[in-house]
């Protein structure tokens, strides 16, 4: 009987690790990677050397695309994890795409707008502990206003 109980526990543990733990750990690793890419390339603008701009655009778009893939194809465990911790993967992907506009040199993006976009990424990924509460509140208000405007346009 003890052997059977051990087998059942082992199967349940394997299922928990494989179907819950593994996707959540992968998401957390991707989250850290995305934050690293955003920190590294958020200040790159049209005045940077071409190879730096190309690397920034590529890295930011790849990070945004991978987050969007997580957002669209996530498991129930990842969905629950994002809900509990307040992650907004779609908003984070949009912020990364916004940061990529600076190095593309299609338009001049002021440093304040880039900083707000980076801060929105921090808020979307639950990494805003280093920001003052006033900044977090202001960014959250901007996010709500942007989502409301987008909903109004699409309606």
Model-inferred region functions:
Residues 1-21:
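Membrane-embedded hydrophobic alpha-helical segments
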Residues 17-155:
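Conserved non-transmembrane functional hotspots
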């Amino acid at each position: 009987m003890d052997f059977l109980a051990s087998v059942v526990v082992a199967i349940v543990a394997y299922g928990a690790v494989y179907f819950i733990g593994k996707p959540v750990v992968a998401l957390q690793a991707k989250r850290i990677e995305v934050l690293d890419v955003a920190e590294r390339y958020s200040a790159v603008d049209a005045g940077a050397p071409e190879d730096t701009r190309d690397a920034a655009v590529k890295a930011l778009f790849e990070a945004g695309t991978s987050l969007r893939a997580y957002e669209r194809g996530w498991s129930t465990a990842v969905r629950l994890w994002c809900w509990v911790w307040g992650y907004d993967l779609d908003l984070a992907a949009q912020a990364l795409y916004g940061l990529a506009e600076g190095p593309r040199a299609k338009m001049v993006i002021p440093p304040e707008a880039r900083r707000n976009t980076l801060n929105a990424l921090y808020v979307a990924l639950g990494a805003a502990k280093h920001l003052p509460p006033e900044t977090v509140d202001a960014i959250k208000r901007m996010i709500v206003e942007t989502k409301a405007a987008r909903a109004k346009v699409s309606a």
